Amino acid sequence: MLLASAVVVWEWLNEHGRWRPYSPAVSHHIEAVVRAGPRAGGSVVLGQVDSRLAPYIIDLQSMNQFRQDTGTLRPVRRNYYDPSSAPGKGVVWEWENDNGSWTPYDMEVGITIQYAYEKQHPWIDLTSIGFSYIIDFSTMGQINRQTQRQRRVRRRLDLIYPMVTGTMPKTQSWPVSPGPATSSPAPPCSCPQCVLVMSVKAAVVHGGTGPPAVRKNMALSGVGKLPQPPGPGAKPLDTTGTIRGPGKTAPSQVIRRQVSNAPAGATVGSPASPQGSNRKTGRVALATLNRSNLQRLAIAQSRVLIASGVPTVPVKNLNGSSPVNPALAGITGILMSAAGLPVCLTRPPKLVLHPPPVSKSEIKSIPGVSNTSRKTTKKQAKKGKTPEEVLKKYLQKVRHPPEEDCTICMERLTAPSGYKGPQPTVKPDLVGKLSRCGHIYHIYCLVAMYNNGNKDGSLQCPTCKTIYGVKTGTQPPGKMEYHLIPHSLPGHPDCKTIRIIYSIPPGIQGPEHPNPGKSFSARGFPRHCYLPDSEKGRKVLKLLLVAWDRRLIFAIGTSSTTGESDTVIWNEVHHKTEFGSNLTGHGYPDANYLDNVLAELAAQGISEDSTSHEKD
């Protein structure tokens, strides 16, 4: 056995028999579930970390990726790579597809490209690892050797894949110099993963769904062409289902270890299987799963549906004459039925995002709330007070600090501050206690924290989140409209509805934003939101108006839905954007919503007391 460290990349097998890596973020999520052990239920819901993967669940025991809406199953595996290779450095190589978006290369190809890039080669020929492409680093382009078609490529930095250290068989270690790995291929076994791999390969090689170029890649020659439009992907497979090492020009940085059970330390990443998946693969995979595996998948999917707020409505056999009584509807029913669990058939409810049309004469102002709109402009800089003067209002000096750590710099309070950034004007050994919550810090650290924030005259305790002063945000300029419409929300039949319309245009980021001077986008505006016109609903509206004036409703950042950066996003105060249903979790009925949003506003320092200090 050899003590070694490696980065772990989780991968899934696509319909062409190529292993595709999950992204680093997804891999880290899988590892967290694995480390949680049996209490996590043995399944990983990928949509929790990447909304684009919402249909997918991984069953860790059978090592399969399950697509909920189609029932397609794909094998997954845990692969090891040299920490000095691309995944160990957070480097991702991507090619531009016909739609203008970027697609990551398969892990082996990306490692090969990065190795040549680090050696400062002007270009690299990928023919030796089975792809008829040249990567030209001077132009950052990919050239098809046969058609001479060129595509752009790029190198970007992402999270580093998870690192593991432990004992590994010597035959699974990587060689110290470039060249093919020396371990012999493992013989095929009868575990579900290997059966699935072999079934996919058999379908592709023997007249399956893959194009001719892909089937050629599966031959023993190991040299083939990558089909267009997909860019260079994983290395060729031989007929035993084992991935072949790269040729002489590529670094052999792979630890060829394929595990059927997922130990701790894995990471997840790129998009899951394409929608045009090989259905035969899914059927073969389903047949290999035993009752316990099916039960786990069914229960995992039920958890996802319940968490998303999808209601269940019993449905009968619609035509009454079918011999199936009733027909199985939905993959959850198929799974639960196959696992011997009771099945209740449901009809999916209709998504209702907007109310029925409302005429101008039907729109009314809200009693007790003046005006029907509110605008915000750019931040007005506060003058005349230094950070030290601001903090002086909230702090009491501590002459004899306790033998504890400052939770900002993690140095002892009895020692000088460990902050190493721009030097505040206070002494690094001064210690202060926040007046209301009583938490103690180096004053030096608090000044540095204030300078790194919004510098609006307020301070938030980093331990308990108590807010001192009036907290403001970085919301870009926009308009908030609010009025009554003559329709009721589900769960609130006795009152009308307050409609809020937010409008924010795209623009240029200011000094308080993540990238000053850079443009930002504003997707999905105007955004329509809904509250019941009840006493508590009007209370929430008044507090939302305070939050709007303090620029706390929106911020500029990275969208958790699309992954787009430098765009307008919600800022921790949830809104209901679904009028007549609750399929997305952002609609009605929701008995706890008004209380929850009041708590979220209070966490931003906005409560009923705030309304007495702000305009209506």
Swiss-Prot record:
Functions as a ubiquitin ligase protein in vivo, mediating 'Lys48'-linked polyubiquitination and promoting degradation of TBK1, targeting to TBK1 requires interaction with NLRP4. Regulator of Notch signaling, a signaling pathway involved in cell-cell communications that regulates a broad spectrum of cell-fate determinations. It comes from Mus musculus (Mouse). GO terms for molecular function: ubiquitin protein ligase activity; zinc ion binding. Pathway: Protein modification; protein ubiquitination. The keyword Zinc-finger applies. It catalyses: S-ubiquitinyl-[E2 ubiquitin-conjugating enzyme]-L-cysteine + [acceptor protein]-L-lysine = [E2 ubiquitin-conjugating enzyme]-L-cysteine + N(6)-ubiquitinyl-[acceptor protein]-L-lysine. Its EC number is 2.3.2.27. It is found in: Cytoplasm. This is E3 ubiquitin-protein ligase DTX4. The WWE domains are thought to mediate some protein-protein interaction, and are frequently found in ubiquitin ligases. The keyword Metal-binding applies.
